[in-house]
Regions:
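N-terminal helical capping/dimerization or prosegment-like subdomains
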Residues: 1-90
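A structural signal for short hydrophobic beta-strand segments in well-ordered beta-sheet cores
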Residues: 59, 100-102, 238-240
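General beta-strand structural signal in soluble alpha/beta enzymes
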Residues: 60-63, 109, 142, 169-171, ...
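Short, internal active-site loops enriched in acidic
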Residues: 65-67, 74, 146-150, 257
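Hydrophobic residues embedded in beta-strands of well-ordered beta-sheets
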Residues: 67, 106-107, 248-250
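Active-site metal-coordination/substrate-binding segment of hydrolases
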Residues: 77-144, 150, 161-163
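Midchain, well-structured core segments that form catalytic/ion-binding scaffolds
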Residues: 149, 155-157, 161-275
Length: 275
């Protein structure tokens, strides 16, 4: 019965998911770490709550930080948590990352899997309960945060100012069941040795918690550079260019395989290939 209901609702679910995936909700963290976390995160939260209202569900906006869509009126509650903020968009997308498309049964858009689809999934759990008039001894709440990708300051703020559910569930994509998360370090590394003057730039294209799949270096022309280029790896492409002052340079682009920072062995680091 549930499978048939989901199949029937799928076209509308895709429309709802498309509505929020069109919003470029990259979180912006103010110095005091307090909400809101940028105008686009405010907008996507308002849009998600509006969808909940359209289905006749109770909604609440907690200071443009966290949103809640509720089914039931029990004194105690179970929370289903997701987040609507996304990591910044890099290059090399085949589609506009904020104009969702469906190909071979998959929706392609920035933030679709991480984590807007979980928000819409939780909404449809509540909608199923409502349409089937299922009575629960507690409230079932879908919570949506807006700064998970940049430090989870939304949760810090919510816990400090509002009452939390008695039980919280976090259906974060395909990760295994767990009760915690790995630690992380965000910082800057500085080399003691000076960098060659022939190196104009070195960069990679990836999110904060991802193995980079693209890395680029621009170097001034030199005999040894030509020698290195001639013996380059097949995964490195080379393009001749000119600097602003008209001197010849080379742009080296390495292609790796992206992966989540929690499982780096699943990828191939483009920076490592380039170096």
């Amino acid at each position: 019965e549930i499978a048939l209901w989901v199949s029937d609702k799928m076209p509308q679910l895709v429309k709802d998911l498309t509505r929020i995936c069109r919003i470029p909700s990259v979180a912006v963290v103010p110095e005091d770490k307090k909400p809101p976390y940028g105008p686009e995160c405010v907008r996507v939260l308002d849009e998600m709550l509006q969808i909940g209202k359209e289905y006749g569900l109770d909604t609440k906006n907690f200071d443009s930080c966290v949103g809640r869509i509720r089914y039931g009126d029990g004194e105690k509650s179970i929370g289903i948590w997701s987040h609507l903020d996304v990591v910044p968009v890099g290059g090399y997308w085949e589609h506009d990352p904020f104009e969702p498309v469906v190909e071979q049964g998959y929706m392609i858009a920035r933030g679709c899997q991480d984590n807007k689809s979980s928000a819409v999934m939780a909404l449809y759990v509540l909608l199923y309960m409502k349409e089937h008039k299922i009575k629960l001894p507690y409230s079932l709440d879908a919570y949506m945060g807006t700064s998970e990708e940049v430090g989870m300051f939304d949760i810090d703020y919510f816990v400090a100012h509002y009452q939390c559910p008695e039980l919280s569930l976090v259906p974060d994509s395909g990760f295994p069941v767990c009760c915690g998360e790995r630690g992380s370090f965000n910082g800057e590394l500085t080399a003691n040795d000076s960098v060659s003057e022939r190196l104009i730039s070195l960069s990679c294209d990836c999110g904060l918690y991802s193995v980079p799949n693209i890395a680029e270096a621009v170097v001034m022309d030199a005999p040894r550079i030509k020698e290195l280029i001639s013996s380059r790896k097949s995964s490195v492409t080379v393009e001749q260019m000119q600097t602003e002052n008209g001197k010849r340079a080379w742009k080296l682009t390495a292609h790796g395989i992206t992966a989540h920072g929690a499982s780096p062995k699943a990828g191939s680091n483009a920076l490592t290939i380039l170096c």
